[in-house]
Each structure stands twice: as C-alpha cells, then as structure tokens.
Amino acid sequence: METVFDINEIMKILPHRYPFLLVDRIVEYVAGERIVGIKNVSINEPFFQGHFPGHPVMPGVLIVEAMAQVGGIYAYVTLGDEVRDKVCYFASIDNVKFRKPVVPGDQLRIEVTISGCKRGIWCFSARATVNGKLVTEAELKATFADKEKL
C-alpha cells in the first residue's frame, strides 16, 4: 500500500493533534473523486481506558470523526491556499450505520467519496472497513470557517 501523505504531511494539513488526530496516512487521493486513509488502532489509544475496561471497543463517534478528518484532508488539499487559514467543521452527519466493532489491533481503511460541493458545503459518503469488511458507513457534510470568527 503506497503512502500518498504520511503523518508529517497530514499534520501540516489538519489542525488536529494527539489524542484527537485519527488518521495515520493517506494511501490514495483522486482529485474530484475520492480519498483513502488509514487509522491503525492501538491498545494505547486513550479512549480504551474507559471504553470498555476488559472489552476495548473504539467509540463509533471517533470512527465517524476519523472519516471526517479524511474528508477534511481531501477538502484542504483540493482547495489549497483558499482555505489555509480556515477550520473545517462538520455541518451534518446522516445515515450512520455501525456494522461491526473496531478493536485494538485493527487497521481502519477509510474511503471517502466526494458527492459534491455547493455554496461552500462539502458532501461526502464514507465507508470504514477492517480486513475488507464494512464496519461503519455515513454521509457527511462539512464547511470551512475563518479562525478569527470563532
């Protein structure tokens, strides 16, 4: 699996940092179509301390957040300088389905397909798989806002 963006490049694109940076690398980027990211799920993730002791499961909302971060990378790379000083935010999350639990040792493959962009709202369809099996799917919308207007 070839790396398109490694973690150092991702950290130049996304504002997220540990423990909330949930993308380890990007392995595919097709302008106008899709992006594929990888998240290696380790027992050392801080959320496993409480979710759930003795039965660690990655929280579904963090899988959705990882999907959003992969989509955000796509939008930041596509728009470049136009959004360099802006922050990408969720606008909506729809039709989320959690199919299987994600546990320590799993490698999440997150494929985000771009549905379009209208009036500054990006629309994405996202699928997360582990070993080729679907674990989560969702439809996401995101937009950019100026940092100083927050």
Curated annotation (Swiss-Prot):
Its Enzyme Commission number?
4.2.1.59
Active site residues according to the UniProt entry: 51
Which superkingdom does the taxonomy of this entry point to?
Answer: Bacteria
Return one GO MF term: (3R)-hydroxyacyl-[acyl-carrier-protein] dehydratase activity
The UniProt keywords, alphabetically, are:
Cytoplasm, Lipid A biosynthesis, Lipid biosynthesis, Lipid metabolism, Lyase
Q: Which InterPro entries match?
A: FabA_FabZ, FabZ, HotDog_dom_sf
- Gene Ontology process terms (BP): fatty acid biosynthetic process; lipid A biosynthetic process
What family, per the record?
Answer: Belongs to the thioester dehydratase family. FabZ subfamily.
Q: What does this protein do?
A: Involved in unsaturated fatty acids biosynthesis. Catalyzes the dehydration of short chain beta-hydroxyacyl-ACPs and long chain saturated and unsaturated beta-hydroxyacyl-ACPs.
Supply the HAMAP family for this chain.
FabZ
Name this polypeptide is given: 3-hydroxyacyl-[acyl-carrier-protein] dehydratase FabZ
Q: What is the lineage of its organism?
A: Bacteria, Pseudomonadati, Thermodesulfobacteriota, Desulfuromonadia, Geobacterales
